Amino acid sequence: MKNKAIHDDLVAMINLYGVISVEDACTIINSYEKADLNPGTLYTSIQFEVLEANQMFLVNEYFMLEIFLDEFEYLDLIEAQEDLPYYQPSKKELLKYKEDLYQEETPELKALKEYIIKWFKGSKVEIVNYLDYLSYFLKDSFNIEDIPNSINEFGCTIPQNKFEEFIQLCLNAHMHTRLWQNRGYTNQELSEMKQNKQRS
């Protein structure tokens, strides 16, 4: 198994999950690569400068994004993820997450973006910047109460009679956004999994 495949898989998984234990990383890489990695062989295969170049680190047997190092936020994320399965897309889809800003273009996110382009007032740069911000905000620290201020901060406006529909589109997009605290699953997927489990 080539080290490049290990690095590609690992970088993509850390971007998708936010944090992942060394042991779980081995299990998932093995499932994609038909390999037999264990923590010992994984350590010897990794070039840590590759991870650091992607703002990723190994702390206490966990690979994580640098943003979760502040104030030990990774501990909160690990707790939030407890007992959840890992979302494992196709290998082709997984590797899209090598790009740190990649986000799956769901129909709900596409509808939200189209609505913003149609109804928001502001310069092209302001609207594009807000689209980028909102896409990241949906998966990181989404709070519906922050939406009005965020619009103003980016120099944009929206007609008052369109605001309620915009908020609903935000909520829909968030429900279908892959989240770190869900180990890559969307809230919608977890809800459906819970319902199916209750029926069985």
Task: State what each model feature region is.
Residues 1-200:
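Acidic/negatively charged segments and metal-coordination signatures
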